[in-house]
Each structure stands twice: as structure tokens, then as C-alpha cells.
């Protein structure tokens, strides 16, 4: 497996406004990246996203600016199942709240190439 184990996600603290950076397992599906909060919505970084979905993240030396959102497994059953399966294959684990990270740079970069 050539893919890195972690990505680095930066959110803005909803109380402090300060940058909060974490190292977290991830998978990529199509153009988006997905991470899972083991403790659900109580994780500080998830709370930050709920208050302000603007994020930045880096993976494998590439930096992105984007938006994050919580995946609703009841309404997005196929997406949730596919992300869970990708996490199981990569990490042998898939339990928790799925969060989608969408790069706002992707389409612009593709047009330039």
C-alpha cells in the first residue's frame, strides 16, 4: 500500500477561533476524503466543523482548502457503506461518525493541468 496512513486536518476552534490540527486515518473515494470520529459528534474537531465547516488538510505533501460535512448514514446509505468498507480494508476498523472532506481546489487544479 503506497498511500499514507494519515492526513492532517485543521479546523477552527468554535470557542477560541484558534487553529486545531489533528492527525487522523482517512480514505479517499472519488474526489473526496473521508475520516471517522471514533467518539462521534463529541470530538472537538467534529464540534468545530459543526460550527464552521471551513477546513484545511494535507495528505502526502499536498495541501487543500475545503469544506467538511457529516455524512448521514440513514440518508446516504450507499456512501456510508462504501466509506466503511474502504476503512475496513485499509485499517481493519470502521466504527464511528463519518465526515467528508471536500477540497475546493480540486476542479480548479484539474482545469490547469
PLM region descriptions:
Residues 4-38, 55:
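Short beta-strand segments
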Residues 40-112:
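Short, structured beta-strand-loop surface elements
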Amino acid at each position: 500500500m503506497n498511500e499514507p496512513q494519515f492526513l492532517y486536518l485543521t479546523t477552527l476552534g468554535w470557542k477560541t477561533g484558534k487553529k486545531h490540527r489533528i492527525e487522523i486515518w482517512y480514505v479517499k473515494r472519488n474526489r473526496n476524503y473521508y475520516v471517522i470520529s471514533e467518539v462521534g459528534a463529541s470530538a472537538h474537531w467534529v464540534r468545530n466543523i459543526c460550527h464552521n465547516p471551513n477546513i484545511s488538510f494535507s495528505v502526502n505533501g499536498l495541501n487543500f482548502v475545503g469544506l467538511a460535512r457529516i455524512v448521514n448514514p440513514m440518508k446516504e446509505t450507499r456512501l456510508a457503506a462504501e466509506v466503511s468498507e474502504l476503512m475496513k480494508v485499509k485499517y481493519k476498523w470502521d466504527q464511528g461518525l463519518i465526515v467528508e472532506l471536500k477540497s475546493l481546489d480540486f476542479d480548479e487544479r484539474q482545469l490547469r493541468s
